[in-house]
Amino acid sequence: MQHGELVAVTTSIGLHRELTAASKQPTLQHEMKRRVFAAVFNIDKVISTFTGRPPMMSQACSSTSLPLDLSDEALLSGDLLAAAAELDSHGWNKYGRIYSTTILRSRTMFARIRHEILELVQASLDAPSEELVERAMCVFLAEPV
């Protein structure tokens, strides 16, 4: 599958949109949708960075939350609500464990910053704003590991 097709399928099945109610009560379906969307969003920014082309997915048109920092075992255990209750207020696990979703969440947070940088570069602005640099540092410093 080509990247354009991947983005088209992702948006046509609505992975870029999340109902407000979905973000309050985690379910296996919502978490899997978040994981898939985050992975595609990350790929989009990497491809844009290396090809010099504009990103195909707009951050402004997405309402999908980051996936929660849960292990695959916790996600599939059947007691997702209890596992989610063990997370901190930002959705990270409190025990410093590194799961595949930990890396995915982190990459997605940086992909959001990268998206804004790509917009600046594509608009031929000279340098990123101080506010953008400061937010990138905040994301970096807020990493749990």
What are these regions (language model features)?
Residues 1, 14-31, 43-145:
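C-terminal transactivation domains of fungal Zn(2)-Cys(6)
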